[in-house]
């Protein structure tokens, strides 16, 4: 598990460094990528967890013993986060929660004509899977902006996938936002696992 993100001081970067930071690869032909993603999805659907371990080894160059993050991993991650960072995360949580609570829609019951009622009933999705990108830009803000609205909406089960190694910040944010299960798996294989389910996910 990584401890921190790379910090770039924009004002200290040369023009070339800034251009490199802002550049994105150009993808003209997506057919090879689509073919590979279809294979990954098919493998996850048929092989389950074994496909997740295989693709984590191939793409992330990590051989995992377990894709599910343990309670001990969460405790260790929390111990690595300093008080200043915890306070900043809590401020962000409070702000996001305040915003999304104001969006909460209650059930509507409207009499459109005498004796004729229309009703809008709002029900949460029972189970949601969150995907948090990793790699060069693991965003703990994505955890907050997905998990908090899901919790406010009343989703009973919230699970999360992120490529390994998952940063301590992402683990800590997941824990305090009420994510019940965290899996260290990324890419198309994570999305397929969330959609189809595996032995573990």
Swiss-Prot record:
Q: Which GO terms describe its biological process?
A: L-histidine biosynthetic process
* GO cellular component terms attached to this protein's record: cytosol
Q: How is the cofactor bound?
A: Binds 1 zinc ion per subunit.
Entry-linked InterPro entries: Ald_DH/histidinol_DH (IPR016161), Hstdl_DH (IPR012131)
Pfam families assigned: Histidinol_dh
- Disulphide connectivity of cysteines: none
Task: Enumerate the Gene3D superfamilies for this protein.
Answer: Nitrogenase molybdenum iron protein domain
Known EC number: 1.1.1.23
Q: In which pathway does it act?
A: Amino-acid biosynthesis; L-histidine biosynthesis; L-histidine from 5-phospho-alpha-D-ribose 1-diphosphate: step 9/9
Q: What class of enzyme is it?
A: oxidoreductase
Enumerate the UniProt keywords alphabetically.
Amino-acid biosynthesis, Histidine biosynthesis, Metal-binding, NAD, Oxidoreductase, Zinc
One GO molecular function term of this record is:
metal ion binding
Please describe what this protein does.
Answer: Catalyzes the sequential NAD-dependent oxidations of L-histidinol to L-histidinaldehyde and then to L-histidine.
Please report the name of this protein according to its UniProt entry. Answer: Histidinol dehydrogenase
- Native source species: Buchnera aphidicola subsp. Melaphis rhois
Name the gene. hisD
